[in-house]
């Protein structure tokens, strides 16, 4: 076992340590809680941080390991859960003061699976109001920040999960993604974030494009978590049929790259222009795959400004109706940027809404058609560096809030698995001398979640040494 601090160890290393009795789940929980105490004043990543409850779970796990009777694949491994994933008895505020704090009746499917597997739920993690922003800006939580540079956003809407993973709040973190909300924080925080195929991980409530998935520091831990999350749950009416997938192949077996057909997508076709440093990093990743025998072919963009606008307008109308259902005082407590964005749908006709919804189908068709010539598509996750921590989006414009998701959202609507894995670093625009991670997106054919993980694992092995994880401000 390495001399790495316990809070820095991956889930596989922790489980090996428990089996060897080198350390216990209680030792690890205490180390993770100490790390959270060091970092949390700087990044505000957690909600419902209850140390005594976490320690009680760890003691119970410790007793199971002492008897040689671990209860599941994650027994004793610390995990955080995004606050919109219900945990029994806890409120689900959705990042906003507008939601009444009523206790959830039951665990949502992802929370139920990790609890059954013995994971120690250390905390819930933060999100912006209704998960509608690519930042940690919230009327309910303190604003979450990026550990690599606390003047920048960690991304969103899985803001706290991304920040927590980068800061070392244990190895496993659960996020959700409907347009990039796992992959954007993963990219901007330098971690791994998988948006599975639609329905691969049962959720409640299900919705078009919405997925829950792992956010971890490496691919092996993401695959281990998928082994648990992908188990069936009848509450998800959009779930895929149960399938026997050997997720361990993502870390046990190298994926041959010779002849693999990779599309290189460097322009989204809509939204913001890719920053030069990000383009260079993604092109370098393509060269690494090509050197191993993969066939890399530049591909034209398949999204258009009209498709992105259609998605945007449909979500505006959905949000307007959600806000209209609130009492006036609750509605007034929602972030002004979200209220302005949603209110802009007020003048839409029924025909406008239908055309906006039709853009979702057109996006699905375009995405699936573009994927047909390739086994995988690689691209930037985001065209831009993380914005200032208090901006709602990279444009800081309520009516242009989705212009950075042109690379991510097609794979929500098209239902393909897509992962972010770190592929380099760029200078922070906010702090001289600070570096910010760059995310490579790898998308695969529908249902090929294992293949996407294997490609990301192959890239981890090709990319070379990474920078050290960020240090607590003032402690470097």
Residue ranges of predicted features:
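Short glycine/serine-rich loop segments
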Residues: 106-233, 412-425, 429-441
């Amino acid at each position: 076992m390495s001399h790495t601090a316990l809070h820095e160890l991956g889930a596989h290393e922790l489980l090996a340590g428990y089996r060897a009795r080198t350390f216990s789940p209680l030792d690890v929980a205490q180390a993770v809680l100490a790390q959270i105490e060091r970092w949390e004043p700087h990044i505000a990543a957690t909600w419902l941080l209850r140390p005594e409850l976490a320690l009680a779970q760890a003691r119970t796990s410790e007793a199971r390991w002492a008897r040689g009777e671990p209860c599941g694949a994650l027994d004793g491994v610390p995990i955080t859960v995004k606050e919109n994933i219900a945990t029994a008895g806890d409120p689900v505020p959705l990042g906003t003061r507008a939601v009444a704090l009523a206790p959830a009746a039951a665990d949502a499917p992802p929370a139920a699976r990790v609890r059954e597997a013995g994971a120690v739920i250390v905390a819930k993690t933060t999100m912006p109001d209704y998960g509608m922003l690519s930042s940690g800006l919230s009327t309910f939580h303190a604003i979450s920040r990026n550990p690599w540079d606390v003047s920048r956003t960690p991304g969103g809407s899985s803001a706290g999960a991304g920040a927590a993973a980068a800061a070392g709040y244990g190895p496993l973190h659960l996020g959700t993604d409907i347009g990039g909300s796992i992959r954007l924080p993963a990219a901007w925080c330098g971690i791994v974030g998988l948006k599975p195929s639609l329905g691969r991980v049962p959720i409640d409530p299900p919705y078009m494009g919405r997925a829950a998935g792992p956010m971890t520091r490496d691919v092996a831990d993401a695959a281990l978590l998928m082994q648990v999350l992908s188990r069936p749950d009848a509450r998800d009416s959009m779930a895929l049929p149960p399938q026997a997938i050997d997720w361990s192949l993502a870390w046990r077996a190298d994926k041959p790259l010779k002849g693999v057909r990779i599309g290189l997508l460097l322009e989204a076709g809509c939204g913001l222009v890719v920053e030069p440093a990000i383009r260079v990093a993604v092109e370098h990743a393509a060269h690494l795959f090509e050197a191993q025998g993969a066939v890399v072919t530049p591909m034209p963009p398949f999204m258009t400004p009209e498709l992105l606008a259609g998605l945007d307008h449909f979500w505006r109308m959905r949000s307007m109706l959600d806000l209209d259902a609130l009492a006036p005082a609750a509605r007034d407590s929602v972030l002004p940027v979200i209220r302005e964005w949603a209110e802009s749908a007020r003048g839409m006709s029924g025909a406008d809404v239908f055309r906006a919804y039709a853009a979702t189908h057109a996006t699905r068709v375009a995405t699936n058609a573009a994927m047909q010539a390739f086994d995988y598509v690689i691209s930037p996750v985001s065209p831009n560096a993380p914005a200032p921590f208090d901006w709602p989006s990279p444009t800081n414009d309520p009516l242009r809030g989705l212009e950075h998701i042109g690379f991510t959202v097609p794979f929500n609507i098209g239902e393909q698995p897509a992962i972010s894995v770190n592929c380099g670093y760029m200078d922070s625009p906010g702090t001289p001398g600070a570096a910010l991670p760059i995310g490579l997106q790898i998308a695969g054919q529908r249902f090929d979640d294992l293949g996407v993980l294997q490609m990301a694992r192959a890239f981890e092995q090709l990319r070379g040494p990474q920078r050290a994880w960020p240090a607590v401000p003032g402690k470097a």
